[in-house]
Amino acid sequence: MGEYKKYWIAVVAVLIIGFSILGYLGTDVYHQAPPVPTAYVSQDGQVLFTKEDILHGQSAWQSTGGQSVGTVLGHGAYQAPDWTADWLHKEVSVMLDIKSQEAFGVLYNQLGTAQQAAVKEVVKEEYLGSAVREDGTVVLSPERIAAMNATGRYFVELYGDNPDLTLTRDHFAMKDNTLPELQDRIDMARFFFWTTWMASTQRPGTDATYTNNWPHEPLLDHNPTPESVAWSVVSVIILLCGIGVVVWLWSFGKK
């Protein structure tokens, strides 16, 4: 035991330091967590769905395997896409078409470069400015509601048994009726929308979204913040340096 004492001391020190940092950052993450609005409402005050619906949808999604079958918030998955990124791209694509037809009478991809830039800027402003009001609700425009509903139908059918999506389910290694109950699928889609909302809405007092512009979405000019990139690079460097130090100490100790 005595010959390994210094190694045990090192292990204990690493655990104490590591869990102390983890606890501190975990507390900070808890306080900085994106809000779950009490409800999403239309401009005329109609309640579209509530916080309870979102939380029920989260539980419904987790019951299918959670992050084992697709992921949320850009975590990345071995099986199926990241649903936040997928939803965001699909919804923004629909939104751009709606706004283009309103302004110019044609779809977004039929516009010229200058017109596309103008439409994109309008959509970006709406998404970034979709803030929580003092009463805890978020107001959605008729166009955003239409885009949300169109996107939601795809996910409800994907997790159901729509034969048109059988091949897609095969590609994602999903079975028919992955989530059998219709209401569970509807609320799950609402949960996915909420993750998309936090990924595309500007955090008050900052120049980035609640998720630091992640997942990346070119249609909204969303790119990871410099801080996110810097910390990612630093963490990899620290990991490699740590491994190098351990190997060096082990080799030096044996000599």
Locate each region found by the language model.
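Post-cleavage N-terminal segment of exported redox proteins
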Residues: 1-49
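Juxtamembrane interface at the cytosolic side of transmembrane helices
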Residues: 1-6, 241-255
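Generic amphipathic alpha-helical segments used as scaffolds and interaction surfaces in large
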Residues: 4-7, 228-233
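Residue-level detector of short, conserved catalytic/binding motifs and their immediate flanks
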Residues: 12-14, 67, 81, 234-236
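Hydrophobic core of alpha-helical transmembrane segments in multi-pass integral membrane proteins
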Residues: 16-20, 239-246
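Soluble extramembrane regions of membrane proteins in the secretory/endomembrane system
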Residues: 32-229
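Alpha-helical transmembrane segments
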Residues: 230-242
